Amino acid sequence: MAEPRRILILDEVEAKPGMASAVRDAYRQDYIPGAKARGMVLEHAWQHPPAIEISELPATLFWLWSVEGEAGWWKQRLSRKDDGSDEREDKLAFWQSIAPLTLGRKRRMLTDQPGDA
Protein backbone atom coordinates (compact mmCIF):
# COMPACT_ATOMS: atom_id res chain seq x y z
CA MET A 1 0.00 0.00 0.00
CA ALA A 2 1.40 3.38 -0.99
CA GLU A 3 2.08 6.03 1.62
CA PRO A 4 -0.38 8.93 1.71
CA ARG A 5 0.73 11.84 -0.43
CA ARG A 6 1.70 14.78 1.77
CA ILE A 7 -0.26 17.94 1.04
CA LEU A 8 1.17 21.34 1.96
CA ILE A 9 -1.00 24.29 2.93
CA LEU A 10 0.51 27.77 2.72
CA ASP A 11 -1.21 30.60 4.56
CA GLU A 12 -0.11 34.08 3.50
CA VAL A 13 -1.43 37.05 5.49
CA GLU A 14 -0.51 40.63 4.62
CA ALA A 15 -0.59 42.71 7.80
CA LYS A 16 -1.26 46.42 7.69
CA PRO A 17 1.68 48.66 8.62
CA GLY A 18 2.56 48.17 12.28
CA MET A 19 0.13 45.25 12.73
CA ALA A 20 2.36 42.22 12.07
CA SER A 21 2.93 41.46 15.76
CA ALA A 22 -0.78 41.62 16.54
CA VAL A 23 -1.64 39.35 13.59
CA ARG A 24 1.14 36.91 14.51
CA ASP A 25 0.03 36.77 18.15
CA ALA A 26 -3.63 36.21 17.22
CA TYR A 27 -2.72 33.47 14.74
CA ARG A 28 -0.55 31.72 17.33
CA GLN A 29 -3.11 31.99 20.11
CA ASP A 30 -6.41 31.58 18.26
CA TYR A 31 -5.70 29.65 15.05
CA ILE A 32 -2.78 27.27 15.60
CA PRO A 33 -4.35 25.18 18.42
CA GLY A 34 -7.46 24.40 16.35
CA ALA A 35 -5.42 23.66 13.23
CA LYS A 36 -3.28 21.18 15.15
CA ALA A 37 -6.44 19.56 16.54
CA ARG A 38 -7.62 19.07 12.93
CA GLY A 39 -4.42 17.12 12.17
CA MET A 40 -2.44 19.93 10.57
CA VAL A 41 1.31 20.00 11.27
CA LEU A 42 3.00 23.40 11.35
CA GLU A 43 6.17 22.96 9.30
CA HIS A 44 7.50 26.51 9.29
CA ALA A 45 6.67 30.21 9.59
CA TRP A 46 8.31 33.15 7.80
CA GLN A 47 7.88 36.86 7.41
CA HIS A 48 8.72 39.51 4.84
CA PRO A 49 10.51 41.84 5.21
CA PRO A 50 12.98 39.51 6.92
CA ALA A 51 13.80 39.69 10.63
CA ILE A 52 12.30 43.09 11.48
CA GLU A 53 8.95 44.84 11.51
CA ILE A 54 8.97 48.29 9.94
CA SER A 55 5.99 50.18 11.35
CA GLU A 56 5.46 52.23 8.18
CA LEU A 57 5.30 49.20 5.87
CA PRO A 58 2.98 46.23 5.52
CA ALA A 59 4.46 42.85 6.41
CA THR A 60 3.61 39.49 4.92
CA LEU A 61 3.43 36.52 7.27
CA PHE A 62 3.58 32.95 6.00
CA TRP A 63 2.69 29.70 7.77
CA LEU A 64 3.40 26.38 6.07
CA TRP A 65 1.30 23.44 7.20
CA SER A 66 1.18 19.81 6.11
CA VAL A 67 -1.42 17.07 6.22
CA GLU A 68 -1.09 13.43 5.25
CA GLY A 69 -2.94 12.61 2.07
CA GLU A 70 -6.44 13.32 0.92
CA ALA A 71 -7.95 12.03 4.17
CA GLY A 72 -5.86 14.53 6.14
CA TRP A 73 -6.81 17.32 3.79
CA TRP A 74 -10.52 16.55 4.15
CA LYS A 75 -10.22 16.36 7.94
CA GLN A 76 -8.85 19.91 8.12
CA ARG A 77 -11.26 21.14 5.46
CA LEU A 78 -14.45 19.76 7.01
CA SER A 79 -13.54 21.40 10.32
CA ARG A 80 -14.78 18.74 12.68
CA LYS A 81 -13.74 18.74 16.31
CA ASP A 82 -12.89 15.45 18.01
CA ASP A 83 -16.46 15.28 19.37
CA GLY A 84 -17.81 15.60 15.80
CA SER A 85 -19.09 19.15 16.19
CA ASP A 86 -18.52 21.70 13.45
CA GLU A 87 -15.94 24.45 13.99
CA ARG A 88 -16.37 26.36 10.72
CA GLU A 89 -17.98 29.25 12.59
CA ASP A 90 -14.97 29.37 14.94
CA LYS A 91 -12.59 29.61 11.98
CA LEU A 92 -14.73 32.27 10.30
CA ALA A 93 -14.81 34.27 13.55
CA PHE A 94 -11.01 34.12 13.76
CA TRP A 95 -10.50 35.38 10.19
CA GLN A 96 -13.08 38.13 10.76
CA SER A 97 -11.35 39.16 14.00
CA ILE A 98 -8.03 39.81 12.27
CA ALA A 99 -9.52 41.35 9.11
CA PRO A 100 -9.18 44.94 10.45
CA LEU A 101 -5.44 44.27 10.95
CA THR A 102 -4.80 42.94 7.46
CA LEU A 103 -4.74 43.97 3.82
CA GLY A 104 -5.60 40.46 2.64
CA ARG A 105 -4.87 36.78 2.89
CA LYS A 106 -4.38 33.76 0.66
CA ARG A 107 -4.32 30.03 1.21
CA ARG A 108 -2.67 27.72 -1.28
CA MET A 109 -2.78 23.93 -1.34
CA LEU A 110 0.37 22.35 -2.77
CA THR A 111 1.49 18.87 -3.81
CA ASP A 112 4.39 17.50 -5.80
CA GLN A 113 3.97 17.85 -9.54
CA PRO A 114 3.17 14.59 -11.35
CA GLY A 115 6.36 12.71 -12.16
CA ASP A 116 8.48 14.60 -9.60
CA ALA A 117 9.90 13.07 -6.44
Please tell me what each predicted stretch does:
Residues L10, T60-F62:
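Extracellular structured ligand-interaction cores
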Residues W46-I52:
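Short, solvent-exposed loop/turn elements at beta->coil junctions and helix N-caps
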Residues A2-A22, G34, P114-A117:
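Surface-exposed interaction/gating patches
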Residues K16, E56-A59:
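Intrinsically disordered, low-complexity regions
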Residues A2, A26-E43, E56-L57, L64-M109, ...:
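An amphipathic, aromatic/His-enriched active-site/gating alpha helix that lines ligand/cofactor pockets
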